[in-house]
Amino acid sequence: MSDIGTDAGSAVNDAVNSAANASDGPFVRYVRKARPNMREASILQGEHWRIGILTESLIRFEWSDSGEFEDNLTQMVVNRDFGANPQFTVTHRDGLLIVDTPALYVTYDGKPFSKEGLSVVVKGVSDTQFNTWHYGDEPKHNLKGTARTLDEANGEIPLDDGVISRDGWAVLDDSAANVIVEAHEVDGKSNPLGAWVKPRAHKETDLYFFGYGRRYTEAVQDFYKLTGPTPLLPRFALGNWWSRYYRYTQDEYLQLMDRFKREGIPFTTSVIDMDWHRVDDVDPKYGSGWTGYSWNKQLFPDHEAFLRDLHERGLKTTLNVHPRDGVRAFEDDYAAVAKRVGIDPATEEAVEFDLTNPDFVSAYFDMHHRMEAEGVDFWWLDWQQGGVTRQPGLDPLWVLNHLHYLDSGRGATSSERNAGENCECEKCTEPGARDEHEMHIEQSKRNVSCAERNNRWSLTFSRYAGPGSHRYPVGFSGDTIVTWESLQFQPYFTATASNIGYGWWSHDIGGHMCGYRNEHLEARWYQLGTFSPINRLHSSNSQFMGKEPWNFSAEVRDSMVSSLRLRHMMLPYLYTMNYRAAFEGMPLVEPMYWAEPNNPQAYEVPDEFRFGTELLVAPIVSDNDDSAQLGSTEVWLPQGEWYDFFDGRRYVSAGKSGRRLEVWRAIDRMPVFAKAGGIVPLQQLGEGNKVNDLGNPESLQVLVFPGANGSFTLKEDDGSVASAASGSASAESCDGQTHVADTHMSFDWKNAGNATQFTISPVEGCAEAIPAQRSWEIVFRGVAQTDTQNVRIEIDGKACNTTEITYDQQTLSLSVVVRDVPSTACLNVTIANGLQIAENPVEQDSLDVLLHAQMPYISKEHAMQAIREQGVRSLGALRTFDTAPRFSKELFVTSGMPDSVISALEEILLRS
């Protein structure tokens, strides 16, 4: 009796706690934050139709036989109120409703939607005959979006549509989407989540017409307004991820992480594939071990210590899960989960994976919360089992992404706030302070402070589940085949995903399975990873497929290590672009045509993309040429001056349409260009135990590129989740505090006195978030050597003489190092008489190409002589060396100039 009474009492308490937690939980907050109702002033309506003018370019068309219309948020749409009344006029003529906005001309006959009765003309697109949309039209020149997965793809796959098109219009169909509502009961049962996804109460056609012409960025930004912004990622997500499908033991994995540290190779995230849980020792009566939630004690005898050891090494951890088979009787949590869904554990009946059952969902997350309390930071949701649930039209992948992402940032619940009696944090040891802070379950076991528990960043790792999936980063693109074809598709695939707002893809860098070994392929893939949204190395359990750099030849190993180190160095730049993506609606990776939509050349370079505000990237996705010993790619440079990011060589693109050229790089380098006036902040790498350091750095290197004025605002924060809600150094978050620190940098290429000046302004906002003092290395890349006497450094207007000034001839870089600068001070570096742009070292670069080229020596001599004597005019002579003697073969040596070598020399001779 007492056991039954205790169970009943626990059930009552659980129900009370569930209701209390649901009222302020993440799922309810998500619903309450939404603005799903359209503005009354922008609605036109008949008995069965409704038209919402959301903006002057974004129109919602609804037809409902029942006369009911949808005002709930849906799986895709969270906001239909854009905060302003768009400009439009309405007239009735010849039985037609005509809506005229500055961007669109809509005609509608008031009848069920038809090709003849509903059309929209997009204004301002004069060079296409397809700028008129009739209901039901298939898009002809949509610029595409992304796809669910690259699983088992060897190269190109079809992509879904995006919200932009060269014809000026795109349509998103939301008719089949489920709605999300606040619901404390589902089918008569208590719903611990407080919100639920359910089918629409009525059937209707529900379309969103994007008619932005060639205003591509505006279209994507309004897509974010409609569907919700991209969240701010935690800083660790932007570093290097180590992932491998491999049966590591606990000690083996930690030893590997320690070797990376000794080698000076930084990682921030450990991805533990499925062998963390029981797989091979599962009794066949339960099915396969593909799904599992119980640690494999043979491989990980003390998993809590393992997770703690990873954290001590500066690594966050995600575990792979395949949820398909639910929770079975061999699992550690089976009894608790079975009871929650009404199954007697003694029967060993499997608990079905059913996301339409609130009892299962609640128990499912309790199971995950227990493991998170042990040290798991987020989850890799490896769903591969299709799109069917018990609820028609509800994709289980979408539900997993939605629920897991919101749950991951839940903070402490009310029940957890009462579970922290043994918390050891400073605030909780203050007299009378304990009740004011949120606690972690099992604090005494892990000794985790209140601040850590309350600072849960939302993050999940899963496949794309349709428009709106950008709300649930990071995206897992699936198991990639190791081929050049796979690499060749990824730059286009990544950039094009931005057309549907999906900016945080994570690919299997280096490829996951099958394919073949090609060391240059791996090196080029690592380089692309450095300039990808997320850089996650991954491979299968084959003994031949390890991605550790020391498994490769010396030059490839060095290239790989350099790529991984550069990625970590770029964290200040990447984190700033992370803020830009979250608060300005501009993804890190952009197709080239976003900035130049009316330039046909911008559409002809699918492998090329912009990487944030300052850089242009053109990855090499084919093998090195045997003769030149270099890799190549075609590049389009928009009008202006550009500088090689690594060595400062100057490229001039004078024409309005830009410039196309073939560029060549050795295996240690990829084509990355900075704009004139570009500013790129990097952090200096730590050593030893600090190699994986994720704190706001004490030492920074800032690359500054000449030829134009420039500015950059470095975004940093105190690491708190509250910073993800504010986004501005001047804005207070929900807790009434400022968490963001802005450091503004400006570059005056030539001021009124012809001097060059670079200024780092005092920090604004949360100064406590960054080191009180910093060491700065300002590197002016691509400039001529100057007299160091012309360089003047001032801190708050006072001369600073404790500086180091050097010049590197290889990278054409003037370096100015200033140490221990207060972050609240203003640092000025002035070069009297101004810096000069460096002359490209044509002879030296040509000599380097010819030195390594596999070709006749006599041709090298002839080519080098011609270049020295004639410069750019030598191009006409280079092909004449590809001849054999006409007469006596005894007096001459056959010569030859491979086309690839000529092309590499052309790039050098014609750069500027």
Give residue ranges: language-model regions.
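Surface-exposed beta-strand/loop patches in extracellular or lumenal glycoproteins
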Residues: 59-67, 625-638, 765-786
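Solvent-exposed beta-hairpin/edge-strand motifs
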Residues: 71-77, 635-649, 778-801
